[in-house]
Amino acid sequence: MAKVAKDLNPGVQKMSLGQQQSARGVACLRCKGMCSGFEPHSWRKICKSCKCSQEEHCLSSDLDDDRKIGRLLMDSKYATLTARVKGGDGIRIYKRNRMIMTNPIATGKDPTFDTITYEWAPPGVTQKLGLQYMELIPKERQPVTGTEGALYRRRQLMHQLPIYDQDPSRCRGLVENELKAMEEFVKHYKSEALGVGEVALPGQGGLPKEENKTQEKPEGTETTAPTTNGSLGDPSKEVEYVCELCKGAAPVDSPVVYADRAGYSKQWHPTCFQCIKCSEPLVDLIYFWKDGAPWCGRHYCESVRPRCSGCDEIIFSEDYQRVEDLAWHRKHFICEGCEQLLSGRAYIVTKGQLLCPTCSKSKRS
C-alpha cells in the first residue's frame, strides 16, 4: 500500500543554514575515492578538494528535501501537497508520497518477503496506477531506496530546484532592493509558472479533483482536442491520445502525465515529461510553464534572470559582468584557479571556466 511520509516532529525540523559545514567529509559520487571528502568553498557551490558541485556529494537528506519542496509549494495552489509543521512558525513540509511494495517469496516452510520502497511516488494515485507509472521509468532511474535511482532523484532535486532560487536567506549578500526583487520574482513564478504534474490514465486528467470546475487554459497556449484516428470530431471512432513531446500514441490503459497549466488536452508519456531546455526528466513532476512548454526550476529561472557562473545564484542587480552568454556578479568575476579578481584585467573563458592568463596556460600544460 502507498504511504505518505510525514516527518513533522518539530524536534527534528530545525535546519542549520551552515549545512555545508556539517557536511564536511562527505564522499564525492563522481570522484569516488579520489576526493578526500567535501570541503566547502566560502562562496562557490563546489567542493574545494575536488572542484565538483555540491550535488555530486549529495549533501541533502530526505528532511532537507521535504522542507525545500514544502517551501517551494507553500503560498501556491499546490500548498495542499504540504503540511504545516507544529511549532514551526508557519513552516510547511512536503507530504512526499512513498510507495512500499511487499511481495511474498516462496522459500521452504517459512515465508519471506521482498520489500521495495520507492522514496517518491506520484501523489493522489492508486497503488496500481503508481506501480504502472514506475514500470514505465527506466530501472536505473526508479527512486528505490538504496539504489542509483534514489541517488539520481536526490541529485536532480539539488540541481533542478536549488534552494537559493526560492529562499533569499540562502543567498549571499543581497542588498535591500535585490531582496525585494527576489521576493517578487519568487511570488510571480509561484503564481504564474509553478506546477506539479498529475499522473492519470489518458482522458482522465483533472478528475475527480477538477471534475466540477471548468478547465482554464493558460494565456498563450493552444487547446486542441485529442486526435480521433486521424479524423477530428467523429464520435464513432476511438479516441487516440498523443504524447505532446514525442507525438507517439499514448495507450488508454497506460498512465500519462498532465500539466494543469498546459490544459488537459495535452499529455506526456512519463519519460517524455522533461525540461524543454536540458531534456532531463522533471524531478517529482515539478515543472515551470513558459512559452508553451515545461521547464525545470533551474532553467526557468535562468530564462528570466541571469545566473552567476561563479556562485550559481540568480543575479538581481542590474550591474553585473557578462561575457557572451555567461554572467557573473561583479564581485564574483574571479579566476577559478588563483581566485584573483579579474575586473579590468585580462581573462580567458574556456568551456564556461573563467581563468586568468597564467592559470589558463598552466591548465593547458
Curated annotation (Swiss-Prot):
Any one GO cellular component localisation term in the record: cytoplasm
Residues bearing the modification Phosphoserine: S16
Subcellular location: Cytoplasm; Nucleus
Database matches in InterPro entries: PET_domain (IPR010442), PET_testin (IPR033724), Pk/Esn/Tes (IPR047120), Znf_LIM (IPR001781)
GO terms for biological process, alphabetical: negative regulation of transcription by RNA polymerase II; positive regulation of calcineurin-NFAT signaling cascade; regulation of cardiac muscle hypertrophy
Keywords in alphabetical order: Cytoplasm, LIM domain, Metal-binding, Nucleus, Phosphoprotein, Repeat, Repressor, Transcription, Transcription regulation, Zinc
PROSITE patterns (UniProt xref): LIM_DOMAIN_1, LIM_DOMAIN_2, PET
Bias (Polar residues): 221-231
Superkingdom classification of source: Eukaryota
A single MF term (Gene Ontology): transcription corepressor activity
Every PET domain range: 99-206
Tissue: Expressed in distal airway epithelium of the lung, vascular smooth muscle, and myocardium.
Database matches in SUPFAM superfamilies: Glucocorticoid receptor-like (DNA-binding domain)
Annotated segments matching region Disordered: 200-231
Subunit record text: Interacts with beta-dystroglycan. Interacts with GATA1, GATA4 and GATA6.
Its job: Transcriptional cofactor that restricts GATA6 function by inhibiting DNA-binding, resulting in repression of GATA6 transcriptional activation of downstream target genes. Represses GATA6-mediated trans activation of lung- and cardiac tissue-specific promoters. Inhibits DNA-binding by GATA4 and GATA1 to the cTNC promoter. Plays a critical role in the development of cardiac hypertrophy via activation of calcineurin/nuclear factor of activated T-cells signaling pathway.
Protein name: LIM and cysteine-rich domains protein 1
Annotated organism of origin: Mus musculus
